[in-house]
């Protein structure tokens, strides 16, 4: 089960289980919520292939994609029903939540029993479901374009689909594909480039709409690239499992800054402090005594970048399993698991210390109740095992050399 949390002015959005809550960051009151319907009613368009409509796929092989990757699909059981093997179907739950730039639309992807992209009209009225479109596989990242007319969804096999937000029932369009899971995706403000990062250390810049044409690569990371953030029209920031935070000119594919981190980075958020000049990058670390690092990025007149200030936030790391976080102008909100139960904690962004200033008494219980985390029979919350993100390295050379050494010694003894 996943927990997602984000800040989209003027509200904090939390998703967990089957619910999404909208919280006012000023008084921390819940003013709107979404609960997934029991049956998403997923239907295929006639123009959709089985690959993009798992809800009705019955064959095991749906052909090959460009690049020769074979697709293996299995029929999706009804929620609460039984699969072909006789096991009970997994409950559908919220996986990713993204707000459109104009603040009018909300994209929610689900995982488990029914994998889908749900599009909601979120303002000005209460959230209203516009469409539910099936996903072939669980989504790994979601991003709207700058004019909110479409949304990109990447999945865990590396494929990226474009979904129309005007014709909300239109079938998706396959734009591009990676050979490994895509962890984050950006769409440039001018909508000329789509920027993706994956488990294979790569940052790829693809031209749009001619997505068959790769514009550039930003190469240099030695482990998975977990997060991307758009800084200016030509610059992005990236964080990686190789313990580095980097800034790139993505148009040229040129690295402009490499800053060493104390631990592998698994999440990246960036806030703009001064337009196109000063930014605050927040990095979530993997298994480190400090949970978060806050870095002040500054751009000079000659287009060089530097980290001018660093703040490490402990966030009681080690006492609970941290899964996600978001930032507002004065607070850090962190979600995680404590004794296999969802927990949410608030920290002051200036000091990095836990804060109760402006936090109403009983607020945490109210939010957890709203997400259904305290309900009797609620499933345990176990955050994703991020150790699988790292490359598995096998050393068979040492064993070979040891065997060769023993064989040479045995031959010498026989000659004697």
Curated annotation (Swiss-Prot):
Required for the Mettl1-dependent formation of N(7)-methylguanine at position 46 (m7G46) in tRNA. In the Mettl1-wuho methyltransferase complex, it is required to stabilize and induce conformational changes of the catalytic subunit. Required for binding of nanos mRNA and repression of translation by the mei-P26-bgcn-bam-sxl complex. May cooperate with mei-P26 and nanos to derepress the BMP signaling pathway. May cooperate with mei-P26 to suppress expression of a subset of microRNAs. May cooperate with mei-P26 to regulate bam expression levels in germline cells during gametogenesis. SMART domains: WD40. Residues 47-88 are annotated as: Disordered. Residues 49-62 have a biased composition (Polar residues). Pfam families: WD40. InterPro entries: Trm82, WD40/YVTN_repeat-like_dom_sf, WD40_repeat_dom_sf, WD40_rpt. One of its GO terms (cellular component) is nucleus. Pathway: tRNA modification; N(7)-methylguanine-tRNA biosynthesis. Its main location: nucleus. WD repeats lie at residues 89-130, 177-216, 220-258, 317-357. It comes from the Eukaryota. Transmembrane segments: none annotated. This is tRNA (guanine-N(7)-)-methyltransferase non-catalytic subunit wuho. In testis, it is present at high level in hub cells, a niche for germline stem cells of testis. Ubiquitously expressed in all testicular cells throughout spermatogenesis. Ubiquitously expressed in all germline and somatic cells of the ovary. It is found in: Nucleus; Cytoplasm. It comes from Drosophila erecta (Fruit fly). Wuho means 'no progeny' in Chinese. One of its GO terms (biological process) is spermatogenesis. Gene3D superfamilies: YVTN repeat-like/Quinoprotein amine dehydrogenase. HAMAP family: TRM82 (MF_03056). Keywords: Cytoplasm, Developmental protein, Differentiation, Nucleus, Oogenesis, Repeat, Spermatogenesis, tRNA processing, WD repeat. Forms a heterodimer with the catalytic subunit Mettl1. Interacts with mei-P26 and weakly interacts with bgcn; required for the function or formation of the mei-P26-bgcn-bam-sxl complex. Interacts with nanos; may be involved in mei-P26-dependent derepression of the BMP signaling pathway. Interacts with Myc; the interaction may be mediated by mei-P26 and may be involved in the regulation of ribosome biogenesis. Belongs to the WD repeat TRM82 family.
